Amino acid sequence: FGLERDVDFIALSFVREARDIQQLKALMGEKVGKVKIIAKIEDQEGVRNLEEIIKESDSIMVARGDLGVEINVEDLPNVQRTIVQMCAEYGKRVIVATHLLESMIHNPHPTRAEVTDVANAVYEEVDAVMLSGETTVGKYPVKCVEFLRKIALKSETIPGLQFAKHLRNAGNKQQLAVAAVQLAEGVKAKGIVVITRRGIMADLVSNCRPFSTNIYAFTNMSQPRRTMMLNRGVFPFKIDFSSDPEKTLQTAFRILKDREQFQVGDKVVIISDVLAEQRVDSIQIRDIPSDDIASEASHEPQ
């Protein structure tokens, strides 16, 4: 049903072992890799087999409602932290869900403890925090989203726990992404621009959890643009790629200037695994040009 309607994600409940994900992949056929799998960790067996589940999945959800019933409630914070840390080390997306602003089902303001809980998830550098009953049956669904956004934005102003500094099995592309983030932070770049078809390079850059730099990902495909929206710190756009990579870059710059993300003279780092019709991994540093200069000049990588 879902695959016929071109869903972007499938969330599988009560995943207890990697074989559960493998069975789902067998049903998905050629959609494997295009449609992303979110494994929901909801009981003790899932926690015990966490590492093999993470390796087999695209994303993990810490489903705290059922998980808090299946394990000792006092163990829940440590289990959440373990899941988040292991996902960061393997470069997998992680979502913290359920009971974030539970009191707002009935009340117009969250409790102080709920605010701290959401902030702690942001400090752990999760990719997403997800509301459940607050927006499905609650009296104040819009206020819940507004509070969640305000708490997250404020919490993002201080550095997180940086679990991603200990990436496991980082291949060449991941090392390239690490280098791009280090370069961006070193030169105090205003942003990292990623040119990618399938979103893989944007995933890898997001895995590095840059603190002071947003990631602007440009793809020419609709589904990767949608799936990249789950990645922490990534702002995805869909554009037509030109056979001239310089024109593609200038289109990206123009969009970001129009949206007031960049100004003329801002320094940016560009990382790409796609140039023209060939796959080329590269990193560049650029200063955002004026429209007049952009239309006349072709820039060489620095």
Descriptions of predicted regions:
Residues 1-302:
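Non-catalytic helical/linker scaffolds that mediate oligomerization, partner binding
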